[in-house]
């Protein structure tokens, strides 16, 4: 009889908890429906990285458009005819992440517009859009694109002996021409729309494109396939040093990009490319970036990235994408393939990270933007990525993790699954040499790595790459809460970013060899032409030298220590977000079992529920009236700890989302 009563009470308590949860969800939904009325009645155009959504918007005469930057890069919107711009209403040409402004259109007409940072001024190629106002006819014109060519045309246009600026030489060129630049400091911003050009400096260290911190990009290649940029330096741009966007076929070699305000060497919405023998540093986003492409069919080989927020960032990029035999050091994080909703083609997937040296990525003086700060102190970080491959890398001296896979949150919650981690050497990690972070992880495998610690324990044993079955595992929630606290610090301005304008100036970099200078070739099918780089993947030639250097031993404390750097919020969320639930679980479970013992209750159903269902079983026992503890005591015990935890989560969500 007592067993039947226990069953009934258990069911009633569980139903009661379920009803409360549903009520909470309903209340949350009602609050969400209320929304923010401040943007009602306006047509919206979102600025994504790097496109407008929607690209064509029709509105009645006299209507208003709300432009909002939901990406990570700075953007703007400027009418081709100059009749309006977001600069006039926003007050600044640069609209950073989250910025918004309204533009009203009192008269009918067709208004093509463009982003001055990511498109050509005629709104023909790149980040462009159109607003059609009123009842007017509009049919989008089809532009005839120039075709790329395979070979050099035989024509070389020399700067400055024949053309006073790089831009005038580029504008005069036909597909397949070479623009050869003599040593000098060129204070200009170059936009390339002609395919298959070879733009080369005579001396890598003496041919310098200087943005003087007032011009957007060093060289931008917009919609022009097959353009090669070689043997020169770009510095002090407001945005990017060398930038290809919306192209098929690109090559960058013997490039130096330093102290630019967004990226160093950047390929976006582009396929079939190679970046090699290059150096980039001092960028608040990343030194090297390949983004929004699938399949990318791209190779980054023999590059050095340092003094940036991210050595490499590959948002929504993958599919035959290879990052090989390069050095990533002295950044906030070494390499960080990631998924974000603010760019197209999510999720990030199928990148191959082979034979790299990833060292000392804990540079607190590096420049950064808010989203990059939570990745501090990690070597290789996969944020919401799928089916990536990490092999034969040397990863040393990181205060948090050597290799870490964690979820990423923007509009959607992206988990990291299916990563292969094999034959890496990891040393000197502050939390774990290899770590899984988040509530759940599936399909990741680990084999043949040289390491000291993992979180959770026994990753290679439970999920070997040759095992027929891989175990579904939870991860390090402490790291996830620590990253959340660091994101809050960035949002609140609690941390001062390093200034990209004052990062260390690199010394002379390796010149393009004479035998390579004899080859003049557009970037026609460069991915196929560089397949020889992928035939044999080995450790980096300098791997032994790095391993002989000084590096600390990996920590065995793991999840019990806060993330680094441990500010006030990191410690607060570690104690009350990570450790407190263990205390709450222990107190609920112990008091329930102790109360049953004191009352001499021997219900196997309640005992099983308390032990097998964490929180739910013991919570149901105390709420059902089974407990003899005073009501005030039970309520305090049940709601105090849970209330503190939920309060912290709500505060974090309000600040971050």
Language model region names:
Residues 200-206, 225-236, 248-263, 271-286, ...:
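Right-handed parallel beta-helix
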Residues 186-192, 204, 210-218, 238-244, ...:
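Short glycine/acidic-rich loop motifs that flank beta-strands on beta-rich extracellular proteins
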């Amino acid at each position: 009889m007592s067993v039947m009563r226990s069953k009934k009470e258990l069911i009633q308590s569980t139903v009661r908890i379920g009803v409360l949860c549903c009520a909470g969800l309903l209340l949350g939904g009602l609050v969400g429906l209320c929304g923010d009325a401040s943007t009602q009645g306006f047509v919206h155009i979102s600025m994504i990285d790097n496109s407008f959504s929607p690209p064509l918007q029709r509105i009645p005469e006299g209507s208003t458009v709300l432009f909002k930057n939901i990406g990570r890069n700075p953007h703007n919107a400027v009418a081709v005819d100059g009749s309006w711009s977001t600069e006039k209403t926003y007050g600044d040409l640069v609209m950073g992440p989250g910025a918004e402004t309204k533009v009203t259109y009192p008269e009918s007409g067709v208004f093509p517009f463009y982003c001055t940072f990511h498109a050509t001024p005629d709104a023909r190629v790149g980040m462009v859009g159109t607003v059609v106002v009123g009842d007017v006819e509009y049919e989008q014109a089809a532009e005839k694109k120039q075709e790329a060519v395979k070979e050099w045309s035989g024509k070389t246009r020399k700067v400055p002996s024949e053309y006073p600026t790089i831009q005038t030489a580029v504008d005069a060129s036909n597909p397949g021409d070479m623009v050869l630049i003599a040593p000098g400091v060129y204070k200009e911003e170059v936009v390339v729309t002609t395919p298959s050009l070879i733009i080369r400096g005579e001396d890598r260290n003496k041919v310098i494109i200087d943005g003087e911190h007032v011009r957007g990009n060093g060289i931008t290649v917009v919609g022009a396939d097959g353009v090669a940029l070689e043997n020169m330096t770009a510095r002090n741009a407001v945005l990017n040093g060398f930038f290809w966007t919306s192209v098929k076929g690109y090559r960058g070699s013997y490039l130096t990009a330093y102290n630019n305000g967004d990226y160093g060497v950047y390929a976006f919405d582009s396929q079939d490319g190679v970046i090699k023998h290059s150096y980039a540093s001092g960028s608040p986003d990343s030194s090297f970036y390949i983004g929004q492409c699938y399949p990318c069919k791209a190779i980054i080989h023999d590059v050095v990235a340092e003094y940036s927020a991210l050595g490499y960032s590959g948002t929504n990029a993958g599919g035959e994408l290879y990052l090989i035999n390069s050095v990533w050091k002295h950044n906030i994080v070494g390499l960080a393939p990631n998924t974000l909703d603010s760019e197209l083609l999510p999720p990030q997937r199928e990148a191959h990270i082979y034979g790299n040296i990833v060292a000392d990525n804990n540079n607190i003086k590096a420049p950064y933007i808010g989203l990059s700060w939570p990745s501090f102190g990690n070597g290789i970080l996969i944020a919401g990525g799928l089916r990536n491959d990490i092999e034969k890398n040397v990863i040393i001296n990181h205060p948090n993790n050597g290799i870490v896979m964690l979820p990423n949150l923007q509009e959607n919650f992206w988990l990291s699954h299916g990563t292969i981690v094999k034959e890496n050497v990891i040393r000197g990690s502050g939390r774990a040499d290899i770590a899984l972070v988040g509530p759940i992880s599936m399909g990741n495998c680990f084999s043949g790595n040289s390491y000291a610690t993992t979180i959770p324990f026994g990753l290679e044993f439970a999920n070997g790459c040759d095992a027929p079955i891989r175990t579904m595992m939870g991860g390090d929630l402490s790291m996830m809460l620590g990253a959340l606290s660091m994101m809050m610090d960035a949002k609140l301005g609690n941390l001062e970013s390093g200034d990209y304008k004052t990062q260390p100036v690199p010394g002379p970099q390796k010149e393009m060899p004479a035998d390579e200078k004899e080859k003049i070739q557009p970037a026609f099918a460069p991915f196929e032409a560089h397949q020889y780089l992928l035939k044999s993947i080995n450790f980096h030639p300098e791997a032994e030298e790095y391993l002989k250097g000084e590096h600390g031993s990996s920590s065995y404390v793991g999840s019990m220590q806060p993330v680094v750097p441990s500010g006030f919020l990191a410690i607060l969320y570690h104690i009350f977000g990570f450790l407190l639930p263990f205390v709450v679980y222990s107190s609920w479970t112990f008091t329930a079992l102790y109360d049953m013992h004191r009352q001499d209750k021997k219900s196997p159903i309640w005992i099983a529920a308390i032990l097998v269902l964490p929180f739910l079983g013991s919570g149901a026992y105390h709420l059902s009236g089974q407990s003899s503890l005073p009501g005030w005591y039970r309520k305090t015990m049940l709601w105090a700890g849970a209330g503190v935890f939920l309060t912290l989560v709500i505060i974090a969500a309000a600040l971050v989302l």
